[in-house]
Amino acid sequence: MTVGYSDAISGARQIKMLGLAGTYTQILDENRPIMRGLSAPYGLSYTPGMWLNSIQVSKGISSVTAGHEAITGQINLEHRKPTDDERLFINFYLDDELRPELNLSTALPVTKDKKLSTILLLHGSLDTHLLGDMDDNGDGFMDLPKTRLGAVANRWLYTADNGAQVRWGFKYLAENRLSGQKHYKASMREEMDTDWDKGAMYGSQIKNRELNAY
């Protein structure tokens, strides 16, 4: 299994399993199909690693119970649980390109008997490009897009006396991606459409919004 960039301009990545493209690999969120359609190329970056407890990978044709996409295999993401003993987790990360990332999770019981519990997950990251637009190969295009990502998820769990469980929750994500030639700005988008014959700068601006609930 390998991960590679399928589009250098937008920063889209895909998983290759058994030599086939990522569209043949099914990604599950606790056995629920996610990352279909336009969100598939960015699916991995939409699930912060600090939100996860484990990742389960199975290769080969799987059951169609959760969908028909699992031709080469399945990747199942297991998140932190509302019943976790760790009540508060905060993680701050800063890489050598001065890209900050903040993750927070808090799990707590809502009732004294702990039958009802919840967990709140927050994530924020920002490509600052404070050291300049990365262009290591000198082709005039940014090697990485300028990305601003914010995500919040809230999960609930109710456990009855007989052991039956009811789960529900939601996740909202907002992301802006700006890429293309160095020094390209979002305000130049109209110039790229109308003045392309005059050497206007080329760039790409992508806005993704995602809301799902279960």
Mark where each language-model region is:
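Extracytoplasmic
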Residues: 12, 22-24, 39, 50-52, ...
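Short strand-turn segments of transmembrane beta-barrel domains in outer membranes
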Residues: 54-56, 62-64, 74, 79-109, ...
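Extracytoplasmic beta-strand/coil segments of soluble accessory domains associated
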Residues: 1-33, 53
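Periplasmic-side early beta-strands and strand-to-turn transitions of outer-membrane beta-barrels
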Residues: 84-85, 107-204
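Short sequence motifs at beta-strands and strand-loop junctions characteristic
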Residues: 8-9, 67, 95-98, 144-148, ...
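Hydrophobic, lipid-facing positions within transmembrane beta-strands of outer-membrane proteins
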Residues: 13, 71-73, 86-88, 100-104, ...
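Transmembrane beta-barrel domains of outer membrane proteins
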Residues: 18, 58, 78, 105-109, ...
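Short acidic/polar hinge/loop motifs at secondary-structure boundaries
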Residues: 14-16, 32-59, 152
